[in-house]
Design a protein with these regions (language model features):
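Hydrophobic residue at the +6 position relative to the catalytic HRD Asp in the kinase catalytic loop
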Residues: 219-224
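Broad phosphate/nucleotide-binding scaffolds in NTP-utilizing and phosphate-metabolizing enzymes
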Residues: 1-208, 213
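Histidine-centered phosphotransfer motif of kinases
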Residues: 216
């Protein structure tokens, strides 16, 4: 946290993207059909936003007493990405043609980027990954908690997961940038040792890279 604070690194790009108006009820109806009534979203404003998705607090009717979140793919993402993909591939093709470049395969690089980005917008794939990561850490240690993803309420456009109380690393860093004692703040809020937690997360991520079949490969501050 102190390293980020000292660098003056901007964090708003990680988890403070502008909110896009989404008709959540309509998305649920389209994605879940008759099961849509099982998801009750708390309010119409997301509590977290990203470049591809917005996240809302919600309740699941057939699982009373627990708190959940629903991650919804921004409707504009697919629309704009399809246009961007065509433009990117054309520019790479034109560049490769004009430069007569056979060493640096621009079109192949563009195709790989497009394939990877499409995977990022498919929450069925993310569901499989989330379940695999949860199972790995459940077998390995009780020091890392991964939320459960509800497969019966998840589709290509939405994910429903249980809500785990905590502090995002971005908030901790912002407090450090303001000159606050972040270690004491985390201890007061959660009763935990931030330094030990960061060491645990860092070491477990490194071990997972070597041992796990599937890893979470995007541990930026907005995701921790």
């Amino acid at each position: 946290a102190q390293v980020y604070a000292a660098s003056g690194y901007r964090l708003d790009a990680f988890d403070d993207v502008a909110v896009e108006p989404i008709d959540v009820a309509e998305v649920l109806r389209q994605e879940l059909g008759s099961k849509a009534s099982q998801i009750v979203v708390d309010g119409d404003q997301p509590f977290a936003t990203g470049s591809f998705a917005q996240v809302y607090h919600c309740r699941v009717v057939d699982r009373p007493g627990s708190r959940y979140i629903i991650k919804i793919l921004r409707p504009s993402v697919v629309r704009y990405l399809n246009f961007d993909f065509v433009a990117l591939r054309f520019c790479c093709w034109a560049g490769q043609f004009m430069l007569k470049n056979d060493i640096f395969p621009l079109v192949e690089i563009a195709d790989e980027f497009i394939k990877t980005t499409k995977r990022e917008t498919d929450y069925q794939r993310e569901l499989i990954t989330a379940q695999a990561i949860r199972e790995y850490f459940a077998r390995r240690t009780d020091r890392v908690v991964v939320p459960e993803t509800l497969a019966e309420y998840s589709t290509r456009r939405i994910l429903v997961q249980d809500y785990i109380e905590g502090l995002p690393l971005t908030e901790v860093v912002e407090r450090a940038q303001a000159g606050n004692d972040t270690y004491q703040f985390v201890k007061d809020q959660l009763g935990s040792d931030m330094q030990q937690q960061l060491v645990t997360v860092g070491s477990e991520f490194l071990i997972a890279i070597l041992q796990a079949d599937i890893i979470m490969a995007d541990p930026h501050p907005g995701n921790i």
